[in-house]
């Protein structure tokens, strides 16, 4: 259904925007995403990511969600350069691609996947958690792309700021994909080490990833926004814009949860599910997902 839109804009080709995992990390085949019930079968991170991408794309197509994408882009982003639009689309589509990349946490591999991998880099403070590490990885990856585009003059300051808003929102979605969407502010405070409830797992994950990247690649991790700058940017928006944003965030969250659920079920049960009828009732999937022990690993 990649037809022309009535205003003559080409529908963006979602499939071509999906990044292969091996363009983002070299460890997709060395690290595992899931174990079978009897622990005899292991699903690599690469395999799980491909399955998630497949279901994500299929659901978007089956439900004609690309029209929502285009509408949101027009309403929220307004008039932006093609380059900024491309980065926005890349970031949106690849939430699903990077959502489990934090499973390269050596302690997740060891404790959950029974896989002794890079044990010299075992984190001290984040234990075997993976969602928050995925969130940091996602942020670093896309903030770098945004900073480079701005540095090259391909996007302007305003575009860069808005794209960064989305990088943070999307990393938040990733950090919550095994739990309820709670408070964006809570997440951001934790990233910057300023969480009033003492949950600074975001900062801890950032510090671990910084060490990991430095040791392996001698590369720094992108510096994060200050908490106040973030809160101010969010507070200045019109209510209408915030409503669009909230709906959009829920949609991407639901899509991620559904795709992950289908992909995990395919590995566990050994067959594909092409019936997306119940995706209409995406809340059921989210509830089923949150109460599903397979997903708690």
Cite the ranges covered by each PLM segment:
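Accessory nucleic-acid engagement/destabilization modules that flank
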Residues: 2-7, 13-295
């Amino acid at each position: 259904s990649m037809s022309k839109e009535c205003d003559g804009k080409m529908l963006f080709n979602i499939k071509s925007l999906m990044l292969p995992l091996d363009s983002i990390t070299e460890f997709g085949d060395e690290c595992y995403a899931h174990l079978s019930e009897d622990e005899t079968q292991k699903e690599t991170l690469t395999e799980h990511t491909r399955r998630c991408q497949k279901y994500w794309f299929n659901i978007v197509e089956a439900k004609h969600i690309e029209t929502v994408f285009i509408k949101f882009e027009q309403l929220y982003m307004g008039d932006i350069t093609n380059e900024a639009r491309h980065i926005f689309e890349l970031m949106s589509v690849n939430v699903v691609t990077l959502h489990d990349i934090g499973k390269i946490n050596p302690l997740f591999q060891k404790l959950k996947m029974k896989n002794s991998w890079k044990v010299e880099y075992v984190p001290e403070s984040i234990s075997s958690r993976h969602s928050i590490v995925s969130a940091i990885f996602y942020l670093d990856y896309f903030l770098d792309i945004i900073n480079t585009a701005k540095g090259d003059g391909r996007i302007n300051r305003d575009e860069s700021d808005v794209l960064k808003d989305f990088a943070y929102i999307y990393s938040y979605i990733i950090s919550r994909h095994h739990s309820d969407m709670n408070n964006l502010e809570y997440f951001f405070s934790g990233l910057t080490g300023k969480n009033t409830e003492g949950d600074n797992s975001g900062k801890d994950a950032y510090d671990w990833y910084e060490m990991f990247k430095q040791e392996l690649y001698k590369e720094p991790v992108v510096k994060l926004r200050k908490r106040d700058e973030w809160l101010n940017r969010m507070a200045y928006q019109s209510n209408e814009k915030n409503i669009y944003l909230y709906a959009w965030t829920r949609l991407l969250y639901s899509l991620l949860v559904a795709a992950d659920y289908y992909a995990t079920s395919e590995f566990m049960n050994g067959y594909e599910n092409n019936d997306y009828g119940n995706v209409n009732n995406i809340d059921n999937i989210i509830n089923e997902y949150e109460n599903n022990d397979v997903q708690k690993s």
